[in-house]
From Swiss-Prot:
Protein name: ATP synthase gamma chain
A GO CC term assigned to this protein in UniProt: plasma membrane
Matching InterPro entries: ATP_synth_F1_ATPase_gsu (IPR035968), ATP_synth_F1_gsu (IPR000131)
Origin superkingdom: Bacteria
A Gene Ontology molecular function term of the record: ATP binding
Coiled-coil boundaries: none
Known partners and oligomeric status: F-type ATPases have 2 components, CF(1) - the catalytic core - and CF(0) - the membrane proton channel. CF(1) has five subunits: alpha(3), beta(3), gamma(1), delta(1), epsilon(1). CF(0) has three main subunits: a, b and c.
One of the GO biological process terms: proton motive force-driven plasma membrane ATP synthesis
Presence of the UniProt keyword Transport in the record: yes
First-listed, main subcellular location of the protein, grouped into a coarse class: membrane
A family per Pfam: ATP-synt
Length: 306
């Protein structure tokens, strides 16, 4: 009897968890479409800004913080985009693991990383381990707004533009999760500043190799001056990059949560079915034992009367 009561209790508690998991899955499913659309909508503007920066970097000989910054400065800034809530599988742990690998690699190169974290789970992780944070932000990781993107970009840009003797950094890195599709989300490390020239890969276009031929590049005119143009482009580039990464991370978080809750719901249902079979088997065994005892008692009485 005690075993049956324990099984009934486990079935009831597992059923409650199954309802919670299923509700979380449905909530995530209702958010994923908007999160995906925001991530897609941010790409055209970010790509346009990035193309403009690439054009400036590759077609001009410039000495500006956007491409070169304090080469002797060992300090670098690392921004990790984590989640506010759990129930998202290995989402935050994957970000933290990649961040730790990046920090170890940078320290191995003789650099001094300064860590910035967005998301309550990541902030709690580092606070619990008494790890210093240069700055942190919490709230709305599933639906990041313009305000948080502006706050993060201002803090990172301020750290990047400060002189060496005032604690400025020489590089900016972002660790985030790129949304590929509902099943695949990949953790990425992006060096945002200084900007690196990305060479276009034309191997898939089946065009002849013209690298040995003289290349005619467009003539650009900058008004009022090149430095003023770059000073205007730099904060917009940083803000757009961070905004895009926030949207990618939000879509990835929601997708991970939906997948994790779907798996948890299925596991809870399987466990309920298994426990129900055990309960039925226990009931059957109990009934069989009672019938055996009744039949045995009846046989004993019959023999006694004879």
């Amino acid at each position: 009897m005690a075993s049956q009561l324990a099984l009934k209790s486990r079935i009831a508690s597992t059923g409650s968890l199954e309802k919670i998991f299923n509700a979380q899955e449905m909530i995530a499913a209702s958010h994923i479409a908007q999160a995906r659309q925001l991530a897609l909508d941010s790409k055209p503007y970010t790509d346009a800004i990035f193309d403009a920066v690439q054009t400036l970097v590759s077609h001009t000989h410039i000495s500006h913080p956007i491409v070169k910054k304090d080469e002797g400065n060992p300090r670098v800034a690392v921004l990790a985009l984590t989640a506010d809530r759990g129930m998202a599988g290995a989402y935050t742990s994957s970000i933290i693991r990649e961040t730790e690998d990046l920090l170890a690699r940078l320290e191995g190169e003789g650099k001094q990383p300064q860590l910035y974290v967005y998301g309550r789970r990541g902030v709690s992780y580092y606070h619990y381990r008494n790890r210093p944070l240069a700055q942190s932000w919490e709230g709305d990781t599933e639906k990041p707004g313009v305000e948080v993107a502006n706050a993060i970009s201002r803090a990172l840009l301020k750290a990047y533009m400060e002189p060496v003797d005032e604690g400025g950094v020489a590089e900016l890195y972002i660790v985030y999760t790129e949304f590929i599709n509902m099943v695949v989300q990949k953790v990425r490390v992006l060096r945002m500043l200084p900007v690196e020239v990305v060479k276009e890969d034309k191997s898939h276009l089946n065009v002849p190799d013209t690298t040995t031929a003289p290349q005619v590049r467009p003539l650009y005119s900058f008004e009022p001056s090149l430095d003023e143009v770059l000073d205007t482009v730099l904060p917009r580039y940083v803000r757009s990059r961070i905004h895009e990464c926030l949207f990618e991370a939000a879509a990835s978080e929601v997708a991970c949560r939906q997948n994790a809750m779907h798996t948890a719901t299925e596991n809870a249902r399987d466990l309920i079915n298994d426990l129900t079979r055990k309960l039925n088997a226990s009931r059957q065994a109990s009934i069989t034992q009672e019938l055996t005892e009744i039949i045995g008692s009846a046989d004993a009485l019959n023999k006694k009367e004879e």
